Structure formats: structure tokens, C-alpha cells
């Protein structure tokens, strides 16, 4: 089972990269809807202020009746608050998707476990931490800003053997 979940989460992470450079200050997120071992929908967060990955993945499903017997895989915990878009956790509940697999929790204070809690309170089975390290690494800058309150910094240093910086 873990191998199967990792296969779909790897696809979520790959999809999420499609948002690179367009979603800041939000994180890159990918989502895949799976019905009986087959991907029936997928999406990613394309641009800041527009539909999130879960919304795009669900919208891409041709037969909505399959959602009630499907699993949605998401690289980051579904949001649970109203911002520029409505909460993805509410959409998942409304569509009747019974199972959600999450790569990593969202450290953003307005989400931070609330999305998972909202889903579980509605009777949705939620699995967290699938490929968590990879899911967190995808959004190093976002994670650093949310958890440490500072930008993610990369430093390159070049100096000669005698210690002179060039």
C-alpha cells in the first residue's frame, strides 16, 4: 500500500512543479484523484489567487459520480480558510471524496492542521506524511518563511587558498 501511495504522491509533487514562479507567496501544490487504481483527474496550483490544486484536479474528473469512491492525493494539506479562494477541505467534503492522502501539513497559521481536522470531523479518512520530506523540500522557501519567519537563503562563497574573497 505504501508503494502505491508513494507513486501517486510522486505524481503530485511532479505536477506541483508546474506552478514554479507563478504561485508565490503561496506554495506549489499538486493533486491527483485516483479511482480503483487509475488516475481520473489531476491538477496543480497554477497562479497565485487562482484555483488550488485540489479544485483543478476535481474539475478535471469527467465523471463526478466516481468521486464518492475515490482517493485524492495532495502534496500539501488542503486549506481550511477563506482567502482569495474558498477552502479546499470544504470542496472535498462537499464532493463526497472519502479518502485524502497528504504529503505534508501546511505550516501556514490559518491552516496548520485545521484542514486535516476539518476533513476528519466530516468522516473523511486522512493519511498524512506520505513522501513528507520530498513534499516539504518542494516548498523550502514557503516552509522557511512560515516556520522561521524569514526568507530561505542560499549563500555561495568563493575564496582563494589564502582566504581572499573574490
Predicted regions and their residues:
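Zinc-dependent deaminase
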Residues: 1-22, 39, 64, 82-166
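Residues embedded in well-ordered beta-strands
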Residues: 32, 71, 154-158
